Amino acid sequence: MKQENKIWLCYFIVTGLLLIFTNSCKKAKDTPVDKLPGNEVTDKDGNIYKTVTIGTQIWMDENLKTTKYSNGDAVPTTILDISGESAPKYQWAYGDDTTNVATYGRLYTWYAVTDSRNVCPTGWHVPSDAEWETLKEYLGGESVAGAKLKEAGTTHWQAPNTGATNATGFTSLPGGYRTLNGAYASIHLSGYQWSSSDNAPLGWGQLMRYNDSLLVRGGYYKPAGVSVRCIKNI
């Protein structure tokens, strides 16, 4: 009888350990690798961003929010018309309302995002046009890439937010833009993203919209305020 009890006791111990091991593995497997604790990066203002791996690239899963370059220097802001400035380096909260920053990040001029002091955290950078095109190609091309990058639903995007699945975890948001004369437009409608590449007299960028599934390459006025997603150095 004692021998039989020992056998059952061993059975329950082994079974319990197997269940614990199985559940632990399941939790790790069910959590995307790019979202596991520790895969985060912090900017000079102390903002913490989770990261997402798409193909061979590692991206932040939020728009940049910092007011400082990676060396600690301030990226200034202004409420003025900057159309008369030759190479303005500024950042803004959409509508000059800082409550928008937590969700949509800040808007930066192309001159600020290409400054050698680097608006992205150390070890990260503003993606080049080629890096954006690599992302687009990996996701199946211009016609479908936007849908896989946009946050799903209509909490932040205006309906219908066509095709949006956020299959990548990139969670693109419609942060709008700032014009040279200080007007703001397109929040909830469009998500613009700078690249670091020049298309003189414009800067290359990418656009996603609420009413299609596209990721569209375009040239934007360099003094305009546009969102930024940082990509990890490899």
Locations of the language-model features?
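Bacterial N-terminal signal peptides that target proteins for export
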Residues: 2-12
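Conserved positions within compact, well-structured domain cores
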Residues: 27-234
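Beta-rich interaction/scaffold domains
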Residues: 2, 26-27
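C-terminal motif of bacterial Sec signal peptides marking the signal peptidase cleavage site
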Residues: 21-24
